[in-house]
Amino acid sequence: MQISVVWTINARTASVDRAIENLAEIAEEGFTRVWCTQMPNEPDALTMLTVAGWEVPEIEFGTSVLPMQVQHPMLLAQRALTTNAVIGPRLHLGLGLSHQVVTEGMWGVSYKKPIQRTNEYLDGLLPLLRGEKVNSGGDLITTRGSLTMDDIDVPPVYLAALGPKMLGIAGSRTSGTVTWMTGPKTLRDHIVPTLRAAAVGAGRAESDVRTVAMLPVSVTDNVDGARAAAGEQFAMYNNLPSYKAMLDREGFTGPADAAIIGDESTVAEQIRQLGEFGVDEFVGILFDRDAEVRARTRALLRTLHP
């Protein structure tokens, strides 16, 4: 199982120069991939990772996740291929539907028919990434045309899929799923088998799809303090239906329970267990604000990285 970390590009807490310095430090420590979140009020992840990837050539990038509703498939294909044209074949393109409170409340875009929207989006995006011409006239999304962007490596596409229908799309059409706030039992009993079954049902191999599990992590002796901090920082996810469903399915009382917290042996055992349950890549979000705790956490993750 690959071990990665989230690369923070929040402009409120770090300048662009400092973000790039932080990325270089992560690469020097031996990590081979970072994942970038995309919040609706933060810097554009693709732009940031393209600039940073030019400066730091030793590391790959994943996006977790770019919202589909605010960019047409042709625009996203242009942006993703441009990124790989600049930094080489290092982009892993994670997409998602965001959340109703964001799409309708902030953007004024309907959240209705999410499964149909996802399929129609991929009908346009995937062929364009492969350099093919598209003629897709959907009820929600129409994509017609082609790009003049040849000889550029095609980025693997992942979906933020948690429910069975979205996992079916991810398994049959993409490189896999990126999960968040999803515990070990749910990964073992729901996410991994549903994704792999969809791949096989589409005539693919189970190994053609990957489960990327993103969770908060902290190596610390102050377990209660870290758990309280996680509960405070990630409280909003208890109010988002897709994540609340995963927390409830696991039997968690809230987002704090999803965090992996403890000393080195405790955290290492929980992360290794994810690999035994079929997770292909663990992505740690280092949420503790104490620099020593963050360094200790990254030091452990380095020992787990193959």
In which residue ranges do the predicted regions lie?
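Active-site-adjacent structural elements that line small-molecule/cofactor binding pockets in enzymes
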Residues: 1-306
